[in-house]
Amino acid sequence: MSIWELLLAFVVVVLMLVALLANVLVLMCFLYSADIRKQVPGLFILNLTFCNLLMAVSSMPLTLAGIIYKSQPAGDQVCHVVGFLETFLTTSSMLSMAALSMDRWIAVVFPLSYHSKMRYRDAALILSYTWLHSASFPIVAASLSWVGFHHLYASCTLYNKRPEDRTQFVIFTGVFHALSFLLSLVVLCFTYLKVLKVARFHCKRIDVITMQTLVLLVDIHPSVRERCLEEQRRRRQRATKKISTFIGTFILCFAPYVITRLVELSSVVHISAHWGIISKCLAYSKAVSDPFVYSLLRHQYKKTWKDIINKILKRSSINSSALAGESHNRNLPPLNE
């Protein structure tokens, strides 16, 4: 193995381990907290978490083996199943992010009617459509034998081995990425930009009230005035940072892989095998970033996982104290009657 291959294999191992740990922690938070389970967006986050977990235990290990052995690491049947799952899970995770953005849009733009517009039943219907949409493409690909081991990405994924099917495969690939990546990106941009517009409007209203208050309080201490102005600046940047993170991570992780898949269809451009695996690793990195972007760094999830960790540490400290006490009692000499 070359130094590049060793480095790429190490990256895949790190992505796999972090994705497993982070998504399992999100799942534990969901099971531990009744408040999180009551929230409608929790269904979308739960679906996204399961997609990321399945990706970490199915596609990532085979990609690691493909990098190491430079060949198909498993039998055709296993590779077909993993390729089917990879296509389904990637599409489902993209559409789950789009569904989360729609939920935020309804909550911010229509706050008074949110609970009537986004109920558990509505979320379940959206989730059902997500699964049907995600399953349709791998079913078509599997029926036409367009799933297999792709050496460029060292992965079991969409792949056409027959030259006579090239035109149909090009059309299928274009439609697939348009109705998965591009559709999700359009929904993300539309909804989050609407959310940002409303957030900025509310910030301006709060800023006007703050400035009027500061003008009236002429004897206010300069340090208090400075803190108010600093909070005003932070408020303006907070929504922009969050929305930039949502859209930015989506583009950064998925766009290189999607563009590479589309460019690959042209026989004119040569794509390096190293770049193919790098683009695949970037797509895998979404399974690592999603738990932090959508869950673990939010206040409610942060409080929950801290409670879980403290509970585990407290229990382990009690057990260790009990063991130490038993050991001490055993070492004491017996009392003579």
Where are the language model's segments positioned?
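Extracellular N-terminal segment of 7TM GPCRs
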Residues: 1-21, 337
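Seventh transmembrane helix
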Residues: 187-188, 248-253, 258-262, 275-326
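Loop architecture of class A 7-transmembrane GPCRs
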Residues: 69-87, 116, 121-124, 131-182
